């Protein structure tokens, strides 16, 4: 499937504002698919801690800017978006000068502001693909409720206008699930043929259980959370869950919380107030190597996202990642989480911590059920959501936008390796007896 790459090959400029590229699994997979099809790729994103201003990842040029200060209030968000837009616009000029003309801009939201930059570049013949990651009007409703004051109504109308302009400016729209696709068609007034679903599926040939180098002590059950720690992510519910399990006398439960975000320090203070510092670990930002270690030693994943207008329609990457690592998980009952998890996830009513604790205890006390859900989880993510199937749809969008011949059939999947890139042995998923032993013990033999 790979095509030769050179200065005459089509050039895609990818724009991401809300995350450094190293922690945006979806966009990493996307631009590697473009590279595999012979596209040149430049990418603009904010810096993470200690990141350089320029780097190259597997042939893609990465341009980074210092992120804006943490936003507070309407003025703060306006400053953040304006600052990021201007830095991105400047770096797009740099990317054009250093990497040659680009033919497509792929803008990933939030925010819904880069349609204007795409229109400015359209005079140079650049086309625009909108990669629709978030529903910003629903995000507003989830954080603040229905707008009541004049200022809130103005903000809400502004978000809807920005979203509408983004849909209108795009030549094609890529949605993360069918709920988002329905929004693009209904609210964005896009033709169904112009909106494609590309789910944020993992590369399950690489995202799979390893034998952890530091398994948890025998008799201990490790809960895992992975994801952003913002106001809408419900990570405080994980702490409430752990506190409830301790109140019930479960001294055998620990929790590892992986990720970062605006609420991280508040969550650490909550953890201390609830007396959980001895059993809860906050890892902060983690890389692929650390994620594999923590997920492979954990027993149960937690999806604490409350039922809100945004969360109900969003696919939670954490649920897919738990499944890739053969973790059964517990979740509040959300429309798209059910689409993702099927019977591999236990669902309870939104905010019902007691019911979630009940489900965790059932999984701890019923090894047979835990093993069955682990097997279901891994099988479901491989069969329905593996990135290989999503990648073809994604790459075909760009080929069609530029009128390129289709890449045709994808190359056969690589032969599974016995070890990961750091030399750590994978769990043999085709050995039924060993797989069942592993998912119960989460350690090497």
Where are the model-predicted features located?
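Conserved acidic donor-binding segment of nucleotide-sugar-dependent glycosyltransferases
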Residues: 345-354, 362-368
């Amino acid at each position: 499937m790979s095509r030769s790459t050179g200065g005459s090959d089509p050039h895609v400029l990818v724009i991401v504002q809300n995350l450094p590229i190293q922690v945006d699994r979806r966009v990493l997979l996307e631009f590697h698919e473009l590279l595999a099809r012979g596209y040149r790729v430049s990418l603009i994103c904010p810096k993470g801690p200690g990141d350089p201003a320029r780097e190259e990842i597997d042939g893609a040029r990465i341009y980074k800017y210092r992120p804006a200060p943490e936003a507070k209030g309407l003025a703060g968000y306006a400053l953040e978006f304006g600052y990021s837009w201007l830095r991105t616009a400047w770096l797009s000029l740099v990317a054009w000068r250093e990497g040659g003309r680009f033919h497509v801009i792929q803008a990933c939201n939030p925010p819904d502001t880069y349609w204007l930059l795409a229109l400015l570049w359209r005079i140079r013949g650049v086309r625009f693909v909108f990669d629709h990651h978030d529903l910003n009007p629903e995000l507003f409703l989830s954080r603040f409720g229905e707008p009541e004051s004049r200022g809130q109504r103005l903000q809400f109308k502004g978000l809807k206008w920005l979203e509408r302009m983004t849909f209108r400016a795009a030549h094609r729209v890529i949605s993360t699930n069918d709920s988002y696709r329905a929004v693009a068609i209904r609210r964005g007034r896009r033709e169904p043929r112009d909106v494609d679903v590309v789910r944020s599926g993992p590369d399950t040939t690489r995202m799979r259980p390893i034998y952890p180098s530091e398994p948890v002590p025998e008799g201990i059950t490790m809960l895992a959370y992975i994801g952003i720690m913002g106001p809408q992510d419900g990570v405080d519910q994980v702490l409430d869950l752990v506190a409830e399990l301790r109140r019930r006398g479960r001294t055998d439960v620990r929790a590892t919380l992986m990720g970062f975000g605006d609420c991280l320090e508040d969550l650490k203070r909550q953890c201390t107030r609830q007396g959980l510092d001895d059993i809860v670990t906050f890892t902060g930002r983690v890389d692929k190597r650390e994620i594999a270690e923590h997920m492979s030693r954990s027993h149960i994943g937690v999806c604490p996202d409350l039922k809100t207008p945004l969360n109900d329609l969003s696919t939670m990457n954490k649920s897919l990642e738990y499944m890739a690592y053969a973790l059964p998980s517990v979740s509040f009952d959300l429309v798209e989480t059910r689409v993702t998890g099927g019977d591999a996830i236990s669902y309870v009513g939104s905010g019902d911590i007691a019911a979630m604790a009940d489900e965790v205890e059932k999984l701890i006390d019923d090894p047979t059920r835990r093993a069955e859900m682990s097997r279901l989880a891994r099988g479901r993510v491989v069969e329905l959501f593996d990135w290989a199937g999503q990648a073809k749809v994604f790459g075909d969008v760009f080929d069609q936008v530029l009128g390129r011949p289709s890449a045709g059939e994808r190359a056969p999947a690589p032969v599974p390796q016995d070890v990961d890139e750091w030399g750590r042995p994978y769990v043999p998923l085709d050995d039924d007896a060993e797989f069942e032993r592993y998912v119960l013990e989460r350690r090497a033999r």
